[in-house]
C-alpha cells in the first residue's frame, strides 16, 4: 500500500491496506485494537530477522502479520527458511504469538531486467509459505488473487509506481484477502 492516494494527500484519500485492516478490526470486534505497523519500506526478511525483537516480539502481540518477499528476490526454499527463522525469532520472546503470512504482491514482470532484476522469484513465495502453515500460522494468499486479476487487468491498472507498489485498487484487494483469512 505504499502508493495509496491517502499517503500523498490525493483524492480519494484511501488509507494503506494495513490501515483498512485496522479499521475493519475495530468495527468488527467493537473494541479497541492495539495496532503497531512497524514496517519499513525497501527492507528484506534478513533485516526483519535482525530487528524482530524491537519491531515485533517486544510488543508480545497476539498476532503478527508478516509480509516480506518483494525485496528478497531469492529462491522459494531460501525465502521459506528466512520466514521460518523470523517466526522462531519472534516466538523466542513471545511464544504465544500467532502469525499471518502474506507472500508479497507481485512486481511488474517487465522489471526482470538489468540492473535490478526486480522480478525474480516472488511468484513462488505463496507456494513456499505453505510449508510453514499450521498451528498458529496461517497464510493470506494475495498472489493467487493477483494472478487472477492479471488475467483481466494490465499491471498499470493495479500499481502505484509501475514497478512494485500496489495502488488503491490492489491495496483494497490485499486488505480484503487478509480480512477474509482472519474470518472477519
Task: Show which residues each predicted segment covers.
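Active-site-proximal beta-strand/loop segments in catalytic clefts of secreted hydrolases
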Residues: 1-2, 37-41, 66-70, 102-106, ...
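Serine-esterase "nucleophile elbow" of acetyl-processing enzymes
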Residues: 1-38, 53-60
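Oxyanion-hole/transition-state-stabilizing segment in secreted/luminal serine hydrolases
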Residues: 5, 45-81, 107-108
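Short, solvent-exposed loop/turn segments at secondary-structure boundaries
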Residues: 8-13, 75-79, 112-117
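Conserved beta-strand segments of alpha/beta enzyme cores
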Residues: 34-36, 98, 136-138
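Charged helix-capping and loop-helix junction motifs
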Residues: 78-86, 118-125
Amino acid at each position: 500500500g505504499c502508493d495509496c492516494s491517502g499517503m500523498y494527500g490525493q483524492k480519494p484519500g484511501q488509507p494503506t491496506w494495513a490501515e483498512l485492516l485496522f479499521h475493519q478490526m475495530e468495527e468488527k470486534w467493537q473494541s479497541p485494537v492495539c495496532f503497531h505497523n512497524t514496517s519499513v519500506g525497501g527492507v528484506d526478511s534478513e533485516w526483519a530477522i535482525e530487528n524482530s525483537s524491537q519491531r515485533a516480539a517486544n510488543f508480545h502481540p497476539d498476532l503478527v502479520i508478516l509480509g516480506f518477499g518483494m525485496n528478497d528476490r531469492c529462491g522459494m526454499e531460501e525465502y521459506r527458511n528466512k520466514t521460518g527463522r523470523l517466526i522462531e525469532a519472534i516466538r523466542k520472546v513471545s511464544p504465544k504469538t500467532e502469525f499471518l503470512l502474506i507472500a508479497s504482491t507481485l512486481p511488474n514482470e517487465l522489471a526482470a531486467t538489468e540492473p535490478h532484476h526486480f522480478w525474480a522469484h516472488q511468484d513462488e513465495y505463496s507456494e513456499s509459505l505453505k510449508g510453514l502453515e499450521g498451528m498458529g500460522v496461517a497464510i493470506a494468499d494475495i498472489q493467487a488473487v493477483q494472478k487472477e486479476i492479471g488475467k483481466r487487468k494490465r499491471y498499470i491498472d493495479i500499481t502505484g509506481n509501475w514497478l512494485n507498489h500496489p495502488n488503491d485498487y490492489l491495496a483494497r484487494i490485499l486488505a480484503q484477502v487478509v480480512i477474509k483469512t482472519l474470518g472477519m
